[in-house]
C-alpha cells in the first residue's frame, strides 16, 4: 500500500508491529525501560508496548507533537531509546534509512507561530522522508508564506488548517537568523510616518518663516520710513483722496520739513475770507512745496520758524503787525486834531485825548506829548499857526503854564504882530484857541485875524495879565 509520497505503509506497519512485540518481550528483563516508556507515553500520548500500534497516522501525529516539544524545550530527552533499548539502534526505520526517525532533522524555525499543533489534515505531508531533504509540501508552504510576508507585511496569513491568523512581520530562516523583511517593513512604516511628520514640520516651519519674514519686512519698512530712507507708496485712489496706506509712515525728508497727514493744495491763491470774524485779519501764508511723493504736499519751514498746526493751511491765521491790539494791548480811543477841509483826504484818526493824570515831576514828557498833539492839529490848520509861545509874551499873576498846548501866530499886514494862545478841543472835529493877550476864545481863523487887526491895542495893553480867565487851563484839561 502506497501513499502520495511513495512510502510503503505495509512495511512500516510490519516493522512497527514486529519491533513492538520484540520490545514487549524484553521489557521485564530491563528495569530502566519502564520509566522511559512511561515518560514517553505521558509526553507523547503513545500506547504501551502491549497495545497494538497499527495506525501509522497516530505515530505521525505523535512524532510531530514530539518535534514541537523539542523545539520549545531543547533540554528534553530525545527519543533515541524510544523502545527502552539504549544500546541498540531501535527506532522505526523508514524506507531502508539507517538513521532512526527521532534523529532526523527538525523542521525549520519558520513553523513557530504558524503551524498549529493539532494539524491532522497535513500530517502525511509533514512525515519525514530522509535525513537531509525537506518535504515538497513544506518547501511550497515556506515559499508561499515568504512571498506573502514580503509582499503584504500586515496581511493575514492562513494556517495549514485554513483558519485565518495574524502573520507577524519577521520571518525566520533555516540558520536561525531573522530575514530582511522585518527591517524592510519597519523601515517602510517608519519612513512613511517620518515622511508625514517631516511634511508637517516643513509646512509649519515654512509658515513660521513666512510670518517671521513678513514681520521683519514690515519692521524694516517701518524703520526705513522713520529714518527717511524709504518713501511710502500710494495707489491712485488713495493719493487723490489723501488717505495713507496702513503700515507706512510719513517720511521726514529734512530737518526743516514737516509732513502733513492730509491733502492740501500746492499753492495758496490768496488770503482766506473769514465770515464769522470780520475784525480778524488773516495771517502770513504757508509755503508749500509741490507734491512729490504720490501727491503728498509737504510744508517747508522758513526762517520765521513757521509751525504747522493740526488743520489745513488755508485756516492758518496771519498776524497783522500794524494792528493796535495784535500784541496784547486793548484798543484805545485816541483823540486827534481834525479839520473840516482835510477830513475827506486823511480819514478819521483816533488819538489820545490827554485824559491821563498829569504828574508834577513829568512836566518835560507831558510838554513833548502836547507838542505832538499840536503838530497833529497844526497839520490840519495850515502853516500859519505854529506850536509854542511867542518870545514877547509877558505873563503876570501866577505865571506861565508850560504844560498847556501853546500855539503862536504872526499877523499879516503892516499892523501884524505875534500873539500866543492855548488850544483845546471844542467839538469832535473842531479846536478853539484862547488868546493870551485878551483871553478870548476864538477859532483858528479868528485867532489869525486877531493877530493882524488888534496890533495897536495889543501894544497898549502890554501890562494886562496873560490869562484874565484863570479857568482856561482847567477847561483845556477837560
Swiss-Prot record:
One of the protein's GO biological processes: negative regulation of DNA-templated transcription
Family membership noted in the UniProt record: Belongs to the Ninja family.
Biased composition (Polar residues): 169-179
Protein location: Nucleus
Coiled coil: none
Segments passing through the bilayer: none
Protein name: Ninja-family protein 8
Domain of life: Eukaryota
Region of interest (Disordered), residue spans: 1-247, 337-374, 454-478
Keyword terms, alphabetized: Nucleus
Record's compositionally biased regions (Low complexity): 233-242
Start-end of Acidic residues biased regions: 180-189
UniProt organism field: Zea mays
Segments of skewed composition (Basic and acidic residues): 23-35, 339-358
GO cellular component, one term: nucleus
